[in-house]
């Protein structure tokens, strides 16, 4: 079971392992957050795993502790294994605070795998460091696969990862504050556009907007919209098809403030005509 919108790789990862991905759609009207009732409706006797991503890429949606706990409890009660992708865990905006499923893993170590890395929260994309917290038996299996596929992380990256995780988080907090400021600026602008639905993201550095009400003969879908925006506005956006949400486009605000606002002004002129 994969709540949708989802990161593009999730379905293919399931296919590569011989499984069948089942997308559980959460619309913009729900803030792109799936409910227990929706998960229950999608459940089949063959279901084995729930993939849970919060904060989310592409939507920036962040489940509250109570929302998360309700979903975790449901999944455990239904006998599902939970894979929690928490790669954006430190990029959560006030009044929310980072909160990990690790609190549940301590109780159910054989039913949960927490997946994380340093690329996003620590801006260490080039160091290629990821890690998993799960049961030791599963760690052995994962090590066997990794050892024959990509090899281990180089020692320099490992040292850098230890320094990042054990050192002061001042730089992470500064980055989080900068992203929150940009989120506020970008969302205020996009939310003012007629016929565009864009929930206010609560984490990561994305906004995900439903633009289906803007479709016409020249722009029949989100992919056509992104092609037009690249051509006419010089702005690259990502259509929602690959994320399981074909009527949406993803905005990233991981750029300088002036670049962000200039880009949004260009997008507005093309989409809204103002």
Question: Where are each of the predicted segments found?
Answer:
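PLP-dependent class I/II
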Residues: 1-274
């Amino acid at each position: 079971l994969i709540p949708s919108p989802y990161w593009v790789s999730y379905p293919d990862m399931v296919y590569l392992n011989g499984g069948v991905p089942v997308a559980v759609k959460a619309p913009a009207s729900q803030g792109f957050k799936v409910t227990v009732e929706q998960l229950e409706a999608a459940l089949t006797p063959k279901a084995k795993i729930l993939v849970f991503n919060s904060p989310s890429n592409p939507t920036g949606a962040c489940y509250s502790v109570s929302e998360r706990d309700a979903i975790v409890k449901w999944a455990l009660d239904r006998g599902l294994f939970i894979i929690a992708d928490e790669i954006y865990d430190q990029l959560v905006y006030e009044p929310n605070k980072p909160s990990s499923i690790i609190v549940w893993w301590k109780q159910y170590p054989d039913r949960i795998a927490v997946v994380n890395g340093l690329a996003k929260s620590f801006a260490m994309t080039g160091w290629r460091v990821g890690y998993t917290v799960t049961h030791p038996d599963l760690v052995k299996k994962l090590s066997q696969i990794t050892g024959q596929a990509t090899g281990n992380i180089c020692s320099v990256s490992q040292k850098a990862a230890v320094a990042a995780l054990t050192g002061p988080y001042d730089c992470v907090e500064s980055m989080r504050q900068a992203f929150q400021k940009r989120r506020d600026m970008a969302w205020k602008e996009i939310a003012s556009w007629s016929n565009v639905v864009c929930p206010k993201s609560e984490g990561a550095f994305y906004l995900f907007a439903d633009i289906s009400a803007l479709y016409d003969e020249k722009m029949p879908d989100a992919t056509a919209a992104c092609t037009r925006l690249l051509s006419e506005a010089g702005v690259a956006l990502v259509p929602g098809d690959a994320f399981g949400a074909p009527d949406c486009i993803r905005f990233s605000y991981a750029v300088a403030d002036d670049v962000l606002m200039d880009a949004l002004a260009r997008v507005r002129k093309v989409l809204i005509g103002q």
